[in-house]
Every structure is written in structure tokens, then in C-alpha cells.
């Protein structure tokens, strides 16, 4: 292992005190290439919902750090936004907050015959994510989970 810290982890460490000071929650940091362009995306949230001013303030403050630290040698765009209505669930707090909501769980390999499961979030323990599906509780092993997102189900 090279000991090199991923950009997402470095940016998370810089962003965490900023979002906490503003009474926000850091949901995720992504470093992605789309259509030949690089994007550094920071997703924030709060109980009452994110406002444009929240995104602008986090963007302004993290941009100062990025300019000073200069972690990327090439050009990229910084985006700060809410995680959206299909937000990912990352922390234990997320699993508690969204208990009873419909979620989409994607797995690395088929679990109980499928790589995608929709159901009502029943909880999370040390080994599994629990959902209710067709009046039955299912335990999806954490080692198999690729992502868990809220499912708005229009």
C-alpha cells in the first residue's frame, strides 16, 4: 500500500469542520470524470433541507482551502449540493433517521436471487441492513452492499 490518501478523504477532512460549524452534515465527497471533465462534488444536508446559501458558503470556504492546498494538478469543477431525493445512506445516523422509508439496496453479487432490493428500511446492525419486503424482513449482508439510497418511488 502506498500510503497515499485519496482525494475524497482529504477533502472530507477539510470539509467536515466547515459543515459542522454551519450546522450541516457532510453526506459524501466524490471525485469523478464525466465527459472528459473532472468534478469534485461535495454533498451536504440538514434536517430542514439545504438552501442555496448553504451550498454557496461551503463552496466559498472549501475553495479557499483547495486553492491553498492545491491537491489536483489539472483543472476541475467544484460542485456543492444537496444529495437529492434519492440520497445515499452512509452513516448509522442516516439509517436511524430514515427508518421506515423506502430504500433501494444494490449489491455486488446476487443476494437472494437479485442484485437490487426495494423495501422499507427496518434498521442496520453490525452485519446487515434490514428491510421489510412483502411483509417479510430481509437481512442484506453489509459485505455484499454496494449502495443504499432512498427510493422516492414516484
Swiss-Prot record:
Main localization, broad class: cytoplasm
InterPro entries registered for this protein in UniProt: Ribosome_maturation_RimP, RimP_C, RimP_C_sf, RimP_N, RimP_N_sf
Full protein name: Ribosome maturation factor RimP
Subcellular location: Cytoplasm
The keyword Cytoplasm is assigned to this record: yes
GO BP: ribosomal small subunit assembly; translation
SUPFAM superfamilies reported for this sequence: YhbC-like, C-terminal domain, YhbC-like, N-terminal domain
Family in the record: Belongs to the RimP family.
Source organism per UniProt: Heliobacterium modesticaldum (strain ATCC 51547 / Ice1)
Keyword terms: Cytoplasm, Ribosome biogenesis
Pfam families: DUF150_C, RimP_N
Any one annotated GO CC term: cytosol
Summary of the function given for this chain in its UniProt record: Required for maturation of 30S ribosomal subunits.
